[in-house]
Amino acid sequence: MADRDSGSEQGGAALGSGGSLGHPGSGSGSGGGGGGGGGGGGSGGGGGAPGGLQHETQELASKRVDIQNKRFYLDVKQNAKGRFLKIAEVGAGGNKSRLTLSMSVAVEFRDYLGDFIEHYAQLGPSQPPDLAQAQDEPRRALKSEFLVRENRKYYMDLKENQRGRFLRIRQTVNRGPGLGSTQGQTIALPAQGLIEFRDALAKLIDDYGVEEEPAELPEGTSLTVDNKRFFFDVGSNKYGVFMRVSEVKPTYRNSITVPYKVWAKFGHTFCKYSEEMKKIQEKQREKRAACEQLHQQQQQQQEETTAATLLLQGEEEGEED
């Protein structure tokens, strides 16, 4: 896609038309005017909030950031599935684009913004507008990153066109096997406002990002067998507590994740096979001992037979003399 249509004034019209925005806490008339259909944007087409009907979603906080001729709204919301962040861009023509992030993804996104801010600060001056406008072909991104979390993908590209430098953020949602990905949602942040946007996001994360205290979990451990090392690490996510068992060799690493609810079954299974192997090994030892005893008996019988034969031969030779 050429850079000239990367901004949301054009891209947002095609990608973000699934309802109007609601920002009860915004301080501008234009923001309040879009507030009438806020719930529809939360659960409708577009990126889609993480589930829930309009009356089930509660807005906890809202911030507005004005950058050039665009308005950006950052809304922290909560429904039965937890807290999430909606980022909406409203262009000069009223075109809207919106992204939906879980709070954990918002934390990672904030950190990526810091990287883009640092990279942008180290760049030289932009190309002259007439030269940039003369180049119709798409230009390579100045810096790119992407995030993949569950069924959502986020693509971040620091780019430049005749209007200047901007951070383009695109979100796609995978609806499941056979359903493919939905049409992406895209916003474009002018580079001059990245710091202000990042600071507003960081404030919301500080105030609303932690919903509960981290779970108290056992410390990890490890053991070494021959040239392998096994690591046992306990963690947790929204699905519950789990143990990650990793097998590490100098040139190889593999791991499995075991949910807490089957630890007892895993332990019982290991103990069962441990006992069975003990019995098998005991039988093998008994069999080897029996074979060794039989071999010794056969060897002893052979020695006795050989001795008796030699004795008989000696007696026969004596009688002949």
Swiss-Prot record:
Molecular function in Gene Ontology: DNA binding; DNA-binding transcription factor activity; DNA-binding transcription factor binding; DNA-binding transcription repressor activity, RNA polymerase II-specific; double-stranded DNA binding; double-stranded telomeric DNA binding; mRNA regulatory element binding translation repressor activity; purine-rich negative regulatory element binding
Residue positions where N-acetylalanine is found in the record: A2
Entry similarity comment: Belongs to the PUR DNA-binding protein family.
Chain positions covered by the region annotation Disordered: 1-54, 294-321
Keywords: Acetylation, Activator, DNA-binding, Nucleus, Phosphoprotein, Transcription, Transcription regulation
The protein's name in its UniProt record: Transcriptional activator protein Pur-alpha
Biased composition (Gly residues): 9-51
An individual GO BP term: epithelial cell proliferation
Subcellular localization, as worded in the UniProt entry: Nucleus
Residues modified to Phosphoserine: S181
A Pfam match: PurA
Assembly: Homodimer, heterodimer with PURB and heterotrimer with PURB and YBX1/Y-box protein 1. Interacts with FMR1; this interaction occurs in association with polyribosome.
Biological role stated in the UniProt entry: This is a probable transcription activator that specifically binds the purine-rich single strand of the PUR element located upstream of the c-Myc gene. May play a role in the initiation of DNA replication and in recombination.
Gene assigned in the entry: Pura
Any one cellular-component term (Gene Ontology): neuronal cell body
Compositional bias of kind Low complexity: 294-313
